[in-house]
From Swiss-Prot:
Pfam families: SHMT (PF00464). The gene is glyA. Homodimer. The keyword Zinc-finger does not apply. This is Serine hydroxymethyltransferase. It comes from Tolumonas auensis (strain DSM 9187 / NBRC 110442 / TA 4). Its cofactor is pyridoxal 5'-phosphate.
Amino acid sequence: MLKRDMNIADYDPELWASIVEETQRQEEHIELIASENYTSPRVMQAQGSQLTNKYAEGYPGKRYYGGCEFVDKTETLAIERAKALFGAVYANVQPHSGSQANAAVYMALLKPGDTVLGMNLAHGGHLTHGSPVNFSGKLYNIVPYGIDASGKIDYVELERLALEHKPKMVLGGFSAYSGVVDWAKMREIADKVGAYLFVDMAHVAGLVAAGVYPNPVPHAHVVTSTTHKTLAGPRGGLILSAVNDEELHKKLNSAVFPGTQGGPLMHVIAGKAVAFKEAMEPEFKAYQQQVVKNSKAMVEVFLARGYKIVSGGTENHLFLVDFTDRELTGKEADAALGLANITVNKNSVPNDPRSPFVTSGIRIGSPSITRRGFKEAEAKELAGWICDVLDNRTDEAVIAATRAKVLDICKRLPVYA
């Protein structure tokens, strides 16, 4: 018999210490990694439930194991909420991650060697959009597209590449692009060559759910997402479609199970269901609106302080600071800011002369600080502190003073009250 009062702290103090340390780090550091966010205690409660014990290969009503009548309810709730949230007629909530959701779409719609137009990783794309080190770049013929001199997606070049290479799929979406994508234009280009339009909206799903960023679901044949990032749910993946085609839905379902996964994680699916419900609340829309406001406010300060921003600004939750005109690398900036309890990630910029391990930029995202309660005033103040550290990255006094300011604001605006 298992006793409910078992705890990690008494049984495994070494592991518990690492959990406590990470909890403290999250509370005492300002998180600016664009792909990270703080999920709600309700989501964590679902993930810590007894649903973790249940194996449920298959789909609701069509399982390979018995005893699934109640987890069927859980998964159905998640499916119906996802469809309602994004305006889809089909949803698969089983992918364990965004990358696995993407892998399933490739498997469902393509054959190895088929041609895909995907955004260049160096221009803001994602590993699974055709990077040569990823399965997508190894199994498929990837033709990369990118941004123009203004930092915007070059749709003229995208159309030219589509007409020249006749891809089976055009892939939209990004991991480091601060603009607004014209999904209708991408569908128009895909239709000209008879290609599928597949959109990975992982980074902007929360913004899309709140109506503050264009929804790709009405335009694409298939859309994938993570359920964390701006959506602020558990770590996991999602596949959506507004195309009323049962054959397409069957292909996608089969590509997830049994194609790329076995049993779904029912405790995580429960967490997804909670997150989808939370995303339907009015306060979630206000949160996402503030995410964009904070991102724009930070950009204003960086520009005023003489820093270069890729594309000159932002229309979403993230932006890239470009150091190619400075004697500063992304790796150095990342390290210096870390000493001041400010967490960012080094990031390549378009036409970056430095390696991906060094880079000439950093990526900054506002979802986590906004979740803590930052408004424009705090976002601008924070951007100023970042500039102070970058301008004086070898000055221990400046770093120490900034760290003290960070600790103070983190105490005033905790992650979990």
